[in-house]
């Protein structure tokens, strides 16, 4: 099993102290948490994308590019890229550039996004956001795979033999589909043979387990090999200490502060008490053995091979946050890595034959994903660095005075 640390870059008062950090300090905290994740041995670090208060994660490629410059090993995730709000051409340009700068460490989790305010900002309606997401993804994946793209699109100007640069480093980038509440995202992932990442944050696990069950069903319907399924799952919170009593006592003021924040926004808490939160939510709070057992319970329901933890302290002190993550890597992760399998692909840059995959359908007037023809081509397998094909060059090579560093060893 692989472990990610993920942040949505919430910019709100600390749930315990009530102090809100300056914006630049909050960004600095995100960078520090990414460096800590690499130092401690996490397999990936993810940055969300939201375009409304209280989030300041409106530009994940910029944040991830900065992290890429300061790290060398950890894989870099978006969590999620809101393709329903974005021009897929510009999204491709940003992420292909980031993929080169990071030496092929980029992985995308895509989704339609949440929130009425950001839909209004981008003039997207609840009725068309699924079609926008599906169309943007189809165009995005074609650009990543094909040197020239023609697409009769509905939500952006049509493309005719369009060339988009730079050409990609990974061939192709791995794309996960974020899933929280709807079968549309699940079906889109299954249709293309892409991995699924279940949010598993807001509610008890039952609705998430049902969506994952539906994903597996649709995966087989579309003719993909069941052995190639990959599922990731989130957690609502994390704090481990030597004893469960110590963990619960330390986390109680954090939970109570978060509860007060929810009530101030007029939200009805899903978990009204800390005890209920520890028992029924996806939060991993307790002793190392309790955390191990809870992840196993999730694995029995989800069959997931990637688990994410919250990257932020979120009310814990800096010392508590670091000690808890160190405990995770020293006593929890080694056990889970032995007992839960890895995803069915190599954890590294993806390279395949430079032949475009067959597309399931041209992008014309989008229709619901469930009515589209199945795609039976399997996801391209990763190969070892020794087998890596030479990336296709840009039309003109950079000058000798270029200051860009060479890609990291792959």
What does each model-identified segment do?
Residues 54-78, 132, 136, 326-340:
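Alpha-helix-loop-beta-strand connector modules within alpha/beta enzyme cores
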Residues 1-71, 75, 171-173, 346-352, ...:
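N-terminal beta1-alpha1-beta2 module of alpha/beta enzyme domains
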Residues 13-27, 81-89, 171-181, 279-288:
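Active-site mouth loops of central-metabolism enzymes
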């Amino acid at each position: 099993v692989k472990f990610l640390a993920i942040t949505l870059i919430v910019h709100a008062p600390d749930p315990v102290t009530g102090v809100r950090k300056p914006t630049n300090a909050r960004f600095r905290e995100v960078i520090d948490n990414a460096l800590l994740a690499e130092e401690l041995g996490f397999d990936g670090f993810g940055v969300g994308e939201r375009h409304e208060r209280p989030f300041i994660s409106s530009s994940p490629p910029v944040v991830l590019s900065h992290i890429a410059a300061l790290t060398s090993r950890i894989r870099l995730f978006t969590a999620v890229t809101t393709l329903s709000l974005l021009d897929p051409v510009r999204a491709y340009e940003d992420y292909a550039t980031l993929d080169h700068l990071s030496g092929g460490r980029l992985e995308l989790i895509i989704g339609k996004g949440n929130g009425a305010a950001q839909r209004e900002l981008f003039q997207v309606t609840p009725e068309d956001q699924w079609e926008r997401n599906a169309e943007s993804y189809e165009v995005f994946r074609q650009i990543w795979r094909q040197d020239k793209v023609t697409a009769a699109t509905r939500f952006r100007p049509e493309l005719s033999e369009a060339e988009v640069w730079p050409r990609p480093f990974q061939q192709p980038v791995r794309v996960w589909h974020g899933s929280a509440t709807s079968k549309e995202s699940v079906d889109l992932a299954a249709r293309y043979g892409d991995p699924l990442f279940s949010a598993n944050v807001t509610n008890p696990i039952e609705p998430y387990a049902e969506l994952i069950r539906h994903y597996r069903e649709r995966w087989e319907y579309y003719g993909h090999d069941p052995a190639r399924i990959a599922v990731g799952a989130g957690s609502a919170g994390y704090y481990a200490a030597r004893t469960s009593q110590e963990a619960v006592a330390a986390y109680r003021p954090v939970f109570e502060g978060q509860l007060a924040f929810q009530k101030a926004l007029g939200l009805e808490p899903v978990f009204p008490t800390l005890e209920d939160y520890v028992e029924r939510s996806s939060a991993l709070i307790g002793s190392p053995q309790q955390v191990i057992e809870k992840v196993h319970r999730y694995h029995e329901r989800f069959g997931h091979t990637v688990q994410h933890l919250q990257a932020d302290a979120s009310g814990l002190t800096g010392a508590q946050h670091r000690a808890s993550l160190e405990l995770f890597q020293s006593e929890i992760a080694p056990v889970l890595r032995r007992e839960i399998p890895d995803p069915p692909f190599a954890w590294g840059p993806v390279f395949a034959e430079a032949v475009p995959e067959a597309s399931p359908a041209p992008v014309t007037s989008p229709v619901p994903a469930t009515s589209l023809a199945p795609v039976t081509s399997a996801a391209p397998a990763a190969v070892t660095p020794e087998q890596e094909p030479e990336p296709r060059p840009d039309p003109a090579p950079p000058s000798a005075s270029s200051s860009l560093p060479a890609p990291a060893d792959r």
